[in-house]
Amino acid sequence: DDMNGDIRIDSLQLLSPEKDFRLSNLKMTSETRDAMHKRLTIISPSFHASIEGNYSYRTLPLSLKQILGRYLPSQKKQKESKVQHTFTPENDFGFDLYLADAELFSSLFHVPLTLYAPATVKGYVNDRMGRLRMEAYLPRLRYKQKFYESAMLLCENPADRFRAHARFNE
């Protein structure tokens, strides 16, 4: 959790039965400014991503499961059936993703998405307040065979209810 430094990867190749994906380079930088402030940045030709704030790598998935579990019955049932965790996440961070193209995302998750302009995803997670917000803007995209001039997605829980909005312009 207290990593400092860089990892640089040159000529990354991901192989799948349907398609191969090549990434000319990838750089990850992690810095810990103090016990309450960290930053992880990942930069490649296809995307730039960052997470900044107070977080623990080992509790990031648990944070999302606990917040979403209050609103999604399937998450709550999974949580109840597992052994209780001995730690409580106290994450409070913001995240930012700039996606120049969706080729890697489409290959890894088998989503038929093509971007014709860069997409952005921004948001935050705050465990103490039990809050999360994620907003995505995708200008000019194709999903399957359908072209959209733009799309906007918003997921948040500002009060004690979960809201999700999606808008697609053809």
Question: Residue spans of the language-model regions?
Answer:
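Interface amphipathic segments
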Residues: 1-170
